[in-house]
């Protein structure tokens, strides 16, 4: 008769029957062993990630990493690029815009519609936020 081996508990069960496996899997020791197995696995995965990150920083190969500069100094532009250049070589130089304008996504940004909102001048009843429905009013019979 084949025996059932539990990898978590490192033991053989006496019988390979569903009821024996179910009883074993419901036991406290088995559940503790499973919990410890996955906790150790998660710690190993976290350590691997830390090691990979440390190795990447050591070799300076982090994708999107900002070049290291001395405190207070601006980063040096790439070779062959001048801050006032207009674009690729052979293209005419263009003067920078005097005021860049609002960031993209804010009202007034070029090429974007304004944010939806309540029309100006439509205030709600006193003590309530704008555009809230008015509370029901009671009418006096005449």
Curated annotation (Swiss-Prot):
Localization in the cell: Nucleus
Coiled coil segments of this chain: none
Start and end residues, zinc fingers (Matrin-type): 4-36
Keyword RNA-binding listed: yes
One record GO biological process: mRNA 5'-splice site recognition
Alphabetized Pfam families for the sequence: zf-U1
MF GO annotations: mRNA binding; pre-mRNA 5'-splice site binding; U1 snRNA binding; zinc ion binding
Keywords: Metal-binding, Nucleus, Ribonucleoprotein, RNA-binding, Zinc, Zinc-finger
Keyword Metal-binding: yes
Stored PROSITE patterns: ZF_MATRIN
GO cellular component: commitment complex; U1 snRNP; U2-type prespliceosome
Family: Belongs to the U1 small nuclear ribonucleoprotein C family.
Function as written in the Swiss-Prot or TrEMBL entry: Component of the spliceosomal U1 snRNP, which is essential for recognition of the pre-mRNA 5' splice-site and the subsequent assembly of the spliceosome. U1-C is directly involved in initial 5' splice-site recognition for both constitutive and regulated alternative splicing. The interaction with the 5' splice-site seems to precede base-pairing between the pre-mRNA and the U1 snRNA. Stimulates commitment or early (E) complex formation by stabilizing the base pairing of the 5' end of the U1 snRNA and the 5' splice-site region.
Subunit text: U1 snRNP is composed of the 7 core Sm proteins B/B', D1, D2, D3, E, F and G that assemble in a heptameric protein ring on the Sm site of the small nuclear RNA to form the core snRNP, and at least 3 U1 snRNP-specific proteins U1-70K, U1-A and U1-C. U1-C interacts with U1 snRNA and the 5' splice-site region of the pre-mRNA.
Protein name (database record): U1 small nuclear ribonucleoprotein C
Organism the protein comes from: Caenorhabditis briggsae
